[in-house]
Amino acid sequence: INLVSIRSGYSIGGFDADKIVGGLELGVGKEGEIYHGIGRGELNIAGLPVYRDGVAGVGTPTSDEERTKIEMSTTSLLMILNGYSGKEGLLEAGGYSVDLLKRYVSAVNVEAELICRENRGKITL
């Protein structure tokens, strides 16, 4: 995930999909909202874009949350490539991600979905 982020310039969230409760919504961090960044402790996410599940925040552009972090026992990954500045290069970064996952962790049953303001649909990478 970090390699793809460095190479593409996109902020990328990586989560253990089995730890996410319900669906995800993108919102804005609130003053005083409790958020524990992986290896960083409690963070102030006020004003930052934040993905939330049915429990609390799970990801911001600067850090993912301890509760939904990827571990050695993770078997289902949710990876979000945030194209805040537009779609240019997003498909290439997604394809590179899938390539790495298949090559180095023997990923199977990989599904990708492009979600934009204008439309939403499954894509093949």
Language-model segment annotations:
Residues 1-125:
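RNA/tRNA-interacting regions in translation and RNA-turnover enzymes
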